[in-house]
Swiss-Prot record:
Organism annotation: Thermoplasma acidophilum (strain ATCC 25905 / DSM 1728 / JCM 9062 / NBRC 15155 / AMRC-C165)
EC number, as in UniProt: 1.1.1.47, 1.1.1.120, 1.1.1.48
Protein name: Glucose 1-dehydrogenase
Influence of temperature on activity: Thermostable. Retains full catalytic activity after 9 hours at 55 degrees Celsius, and at 75 degrees Celsius the half-life is approximately 3 hours.
SUPFAM superfamilies: GroES-like (SSF50129), NAD(P)-binding Rossmann-fold domains (SSF51735)
Length: 361
């Protein structure tokens, strides 16, 4: 048994504590790792609040180590041609089960769901907020760009964006989505929310040629507006200014009332990507006119969750590109750096938060 410090919850009940745990060293592993930075997102906070009923502890355990947005350092590794001691790596969150999608490396599209697949720090598999991690090389993605530094901790949330655009590429082919110049230039993309995930969606949308607007029901901070401006992203307080004629709508809020409010602004042949989840959000009474609007305009609504290993690789490539073009803006995405003992950050967001990370070492 290895005694180590960890941040744990009791899923799905919730709660959080920074404590000492005993974790057995596995008989077989490829790499021994330690966390450098761990990101905190709405999923972590939802778990701590007891708001995510789908979460659960590993079998036979009465706790779950939190943390899925991880940047790890290799402390030791078996002989291989990919990673070595001292390298920085990003671990895959979702681990495969036995379905056909899982068997081909697409556990993000698991055909069975729980308990076939597991997600580190979320469903049945301990996360990365602990001193020591043992893992297999196939579940690690090497950070090739030494200039990224702590920005590489954004790989995990960004891989969700890469996957969502893969979904968009597939479903948008049901009609001619591109403009008459064969590009997406001038097509309108609206992102509901202004947290870190929304920022990453907006940057990726700009890369693809979209005219991108992030929206929320309040005005935004100067820091957020400055970052948006540098990337060419607009912002709208939708209580004052509701965007119209939307081609691609992405929801990061998980709030059905807000989503349906914007859905009625989507163009013919438009696409809606649902990404945010919020099990405690109030219901929305969908009526016949809502259904008519979707059907008569050939609107496609698609949920998108998690990602495959290829999307982690794509995310790291995008982070490197953005960091070269907008180094100051990318540094500004991480707005607060906490210590492991600061568990209050799971209950209260620091003022002006875009992304809060825990510096583990």
């Amino acid at each position: 048994m290895t005694e180590q410090k960890a941040i744990v919850t009791d899923a799905p009940k919730g709660g959080v504590k920074y404590t000492t745990i005993d974790m057995p060293e596995p008989e077989h592993y490829d790499a021994k790792l330690s966390p450098v930075y761990i990101g905190i997102c709405g999923t972590d906070r939802g778990e701590v609040a007891g708001a995510l009923s789908f979460t659960y502890n590993p079998e036979g355990e009465n706790f779950l180590v939190l943390g899925h947005e991880a940047l790890l350092r290799v402390d030791d590794a078996r002989d291989n041609g990919y990673i070595k001691k001292g390298d920085l790596v990003v671990p895959l969150v979702r681990r495969p089960g036995k379905c056909i999608n899982c068997r081909i490396g697409r556990q993000d599209n698991c055909s069975i769901g729980d308990p076939d697949k597991h997600e580190a720090g979320i469903t049945g598999l301990h996360g990365f907020m602990r001193d020591v991690i043992y893992d297999d090389i196939e579940y690690l993605v090497k950070v090739e760009d030494p200039e990224l530094g702590r920005i590489a901790v954004l790989t995990e949330p960004l891989k969700n964006v890469m996957k969502a655009f893969e979904v968009f590429d597939v479903v948008s082919k049901r009609s001619i989505f591109f403009g008459d110049d064969s590009t997406l230039i001038g097509k309108r993309m609206v992102i509901i929310g202004s947290g870190s995930e929304a920022f990453l969606y907006s940057f990726a949308g700009v890369d693809r040629g979209f005219d991108v607007t992030m929206v929320n029901r309040h005005d935004e901070t100067e820091n957020k507006l400055k970052i948006m401006d540098e990337f060419g992203v607009k912002f709208a307080n939708y209580l004052k200014d509701m965007p119209e004629k939307i081609d691609l709508l992405v929801d990061t809020s998980g709030d059905p009332t807000t989503t349906f409010k914007f859905l009625r602004k989507v163009n013919n042949n438009g696409v809606v990507i649902l990404f945010g989840t919020n099990g405690k959000a109030p219901g929305y009474p969908v009526d016949g006119e809502d259904i008519d609007y979707i059907v008569e305009r050939n609107i496609t609504i698609a949920g998108s969750v998690d990602a495959a290993k290829i999307h982690y690789v794509q995310a790291l490539q995008s982070l490197s590109n953005w960091n070269r073009r907008h180094p100051d803006a990318m540094k500004s995405i991480i707005t607060y750096e906490a210590k492991p003992s600061e568990t209050n950050i799971f209950f209260q967001k620091p003022h002006g938060e875009i992304k809060t990370v825990i510096k583990w070492q």
